[in-house]
């Protein structure tokens, strides 16, 4: 009884796109840094820890802020870390001090929808629910919530809308 012939070496896999794999590996190896101050000061020749140390940032927060209180050493024993790139810290602080954008907005379609409903019906939500523009068949309560959302985000526009309706 003979042996089964042994398969030797690796065979080429035709189902894998090598070009795509190489591109993905390159992206993973050198990720895009979204923060502009850090990206401008980044040195590809240095490691992550050294780059961050030059900027005055901590690569490992557990080492920079230990959980257990360690014994207090003399100030002479602890060498002061020199920050080689202080402009990075200043840039990050400037970015952090900027006001954040509102994440929840109202789409232009919803603004148009609410304006149409308020112009035609005022505060009559039951009539709004029967309107032909109510494509999604919102209930009166759902329409009221949308109108209230519009009131919160655009109070001046809503007041002008109601005032123009009263004038008619």
Swiss-Prot record:
Keywords: Nucleus. It is found in: Nucleus, Nucleolus. Transmembrane segments: none annotated. Its main location: nucleus. Pfam families: Nop16. The keyword Nucleus applies. One of its GO terms (cellular component) is nucleolus. InterPro entries: Ribosome_biogenesis_Nop16. Residues 20-40, 59-79 are annotated as: Disordered. Residues 20-31 have a biased composition (Basic residues). PANTHER family: HSPC111 PROTEIN-RELATED (PTHR13243), NUCLEOLAR PROTEIN 16 (PTHR13243:SF1). Belongs to the NOP16 family. This is Nucleolar protein 16. The lineage of its organism: Eukaryota, Metazoa, Chordata, Craniata, Vertebrata.
């Amino acid at each position: 009884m003979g042996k089964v012939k042994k398969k030797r070496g690796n065979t080429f896999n035709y189902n894998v796109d090598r070009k795509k794999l190489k591109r993905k590996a390159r992206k993973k190896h050198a990720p895009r840094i979204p923060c502009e101050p850090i990206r401008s000061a980044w040195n590809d020749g240095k490691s992550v820890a050294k780059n961050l140390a030059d900027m005055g940032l901590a690569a490992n927060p557990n080492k920079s802020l230990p959980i257990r209180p360690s014994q207090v050493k003399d100030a002479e024993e602890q060498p002061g870390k020199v920050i080689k790139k202080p402009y990075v810290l200043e840039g990050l602080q400037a970015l952090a001090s900027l006001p954040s954008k509102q994440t929840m907005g109202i789409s232009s379609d919803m603004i148009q929808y609410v304006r149409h409903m308020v112009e035609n019906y005022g505060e009559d939500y039951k009539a709004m629910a029967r309107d032909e523009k109510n494509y999604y068949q919102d209930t009166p309560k759902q329409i009221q919530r949308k109108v209230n959302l519009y009131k919160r985000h655009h109070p001046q526009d809503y007041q002008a809308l109601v005032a123009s309706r009263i004038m008619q």
